[in-house]
Amino acid sequence: MRNRSKLLFLSSCAVPQQIKFCNALQKYFEAEFWFYESPENNKIRGKFWLTDFGNYCKILKPVLFFKSGFLSHKYWAFSLIKELKIFNPDIVMLGGFSIPSNIIAYRWAKKNGKKTIVFTERSRNQHGVLRGGGAIWRLLHWFYRDVDMVMVTAEDVVKQFRDEFRFGEAVVVSRHAADIDAYLKHPLRGKKPAYTYLFANRMTETYNPIGALEIFAQVLSRYPNSRLLMNAAGELAERCKEKIKELKLEDSVEFLTNINSWDELHKVYARSDILIFPAYFSNGNWTILEAMASGMGIVVSDRVLGMDQIIEDETNCFKCEPKTEEFLSQIERYVKNPQLFKIHANLNRIKVKPFSMEETAKDFAAITIKKLNLNS
């Protein structure tokens, strides 16, 4: 007789954090994670995102990806029902509400007496504005009217799904797992003649890489020999290269093109001193958690959502509007008072530890077992 429930998670794109999280969950569940898309097909990721899927994760094939129209960026997995019947999970967890194959998997689960979870971030439009309970969400609520649990990724998302979308007491809070064990071993930063800055996020409009370059140009003008390391992926790559030439930063900016594997990524953070993230919008971000674990100084936009519980302005980081002068002012607080690196790092490593694979798996299991009455 099995002691562990069989858990299936259906997710969009395979990422190393989720693959490692699936491994961590084996202590509590017979877990498998199935993905609609591989990073090699997803052009927004670097090649180093490709990793060993191990024994518990796989890419579903064949999958139809809708590139435009009403179902833009949605997936249909042709073999899904067959695969579900073979694995026969006790719990079906879905990464999001609106993917067509997720809806099919959900109805299969309900028809066959399975427990159901939807794991979700906040729902927003393309401008980062939170959605209300309009026609689409009324329809989705009808589809998922009998869901057992809606697991959101941050405290500030609860109200939207509990009240606006009317899922009520089904809503609980958990979090994304972060692959931070190697980062926690990095040495503390201290006083240097010049510092290395990191823009770790993709070069996409909402993350404002052009703004990061303008901020760094001001830093470099005041502190020669400063360096900026930049994520090499994203649709704004050419515009960023043009901006680098315009600002004459060619000798001071390094694109991160030589990361050979996921397990090498932490070395980029070890080389860096201060994370700069002047985003116009973000739902919360792994890069901030990684920088916290690494012991870096952190200067981020006040438009980053979902992280108020762990990053607090002037306590363990600095937050400001995504404007050049404001970012420069906050960066200089680290430069002029290097003791802040140690103070913030010591606080951040305590705050970020619960996001590790092991701790997140433990928390997820406790919430799920209690909410779904798996011990009864």
Name every feature range the model reports, one short phrase each.
Residues 297-301:
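Short hydrophobic beta-strand element within catalytic cores of glycosyltransferases
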